Amino acid sequence: MQKRQLGNSGLEVSAIGLGCMGLSFGDGLATDKTAAIELIRRAHALGDIFFDTVEAYGPFVNEALLDEALAPFRDKVVIATKFGFAGGKVSDGVDSRPENIRAVAEASLRRLKTDVIDLFYQHRVDPAVPMEDVRAR
């Protein structure tokens, strides 16, 4: 699969990534865990090295699912996760206060069982928090 440089970050990602929302959140029921792990690993076997998740998918289960599926080759993939929801749930509105960003990052690190988040970005803009405060952290 073709690779791309992600902006000026130095990250190299596959031209096609796997958005993992539908595995544990969205329209209908969550995908069976075994089937979801097989799908993630098959995507990796086909050359996908870029996987996108967020704490709100599940909520709180999608990142752990990715960890379980990708643990054998974690150092060969790029995982993107996000912040921006209050309480980690879409239904609770947005929250991009710096203290929430830090709490989300720390919780995501635990669920992903890693010491680094490859790409961490804002899922929804919080109109109550100036963008300067969001990016300063």
Please provide the spans of the model-predicted regions:
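Residue-level marker for beta-strand->alpha-helix junctions and adjacent short loops that shape enzyme
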Residues: 23, 58, 84-86, 124-127
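Glycine/proline-rich, positively charged
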Residues: 88-137
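A short acidic, helix-capping loop that chelates divalent metal ions and anchors anionic groups
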Residues: 22-27, 86-92
